[in-house]
Design a protein with these regions (language model features):
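Structured beta-strand/loop patches that form or line metal/cofactor-binding pockets in enzymes
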Residues: 1-42, 51
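Metal- or metallocofactor-binding catalytic centers and their adjacent structured scaffolds
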Residues: 39-117
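Short, intrinsically disordered, charge-balanced linker/junction segments flanking boundaries
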Residues: 120-124
């Protein structure tokens, strides 16, 4: 089963205003994340999420830049694919911790595809 496409969609989910009486910290007003979708040639679509601790634009850009490395590859080789991503980002002198946030959504989407194909819930 080959990967045909990867999409990253930035989202911001508004939170209810904080009820704290503290004037120092009111808390965040939204949860920001990037939803990752991985598509296959057999019609499966895996969904993952990565926290956008780097900001929505950078997280989305890292996910989208993984597309040339992953498209056409067998999505069952999750460990190999993730290793390729990490090697590529190390070669480009990017801090691997930075990229690992974005890669978590890709890996989760790949495991989601494998769970769907096996007819099992993802947690198993």
């Amino acid at each position: 089963m080959k990967i045909t496409d990867i999409k990253a969609t930035p989202v911001a989910v508004p939170l209810k205003p904080s009820k704290t009486k503290s004037k120092m910290r009111k808390g965040p007003n939204a949860v920001i994340a990037v939803i990752v979708q991985v598509f296959t040639d057999e019609g499966y679509m895996g969904i993952g999420e990565t926290p956008a601790v780097l900001g929505l634009d950078l997280s989305s850009a890292i996910v989208n830049s993984a597309k040339p490395i992953l498209v056409g590859e067998d999505c069952a080789n999750i460990n190999l694919l993730m290793k390729r991503l990490y090697v590529q980002y190390n070669a480009n002198h990017l801090h691997i911790h930075t990229a690992s946030w974005a890669f978590s959504g890709i890996e989760l989407a790949l495991w989601d595809i494998m769970a769907q194909k096996a007819g099992m819930p993802l947690y198993q």
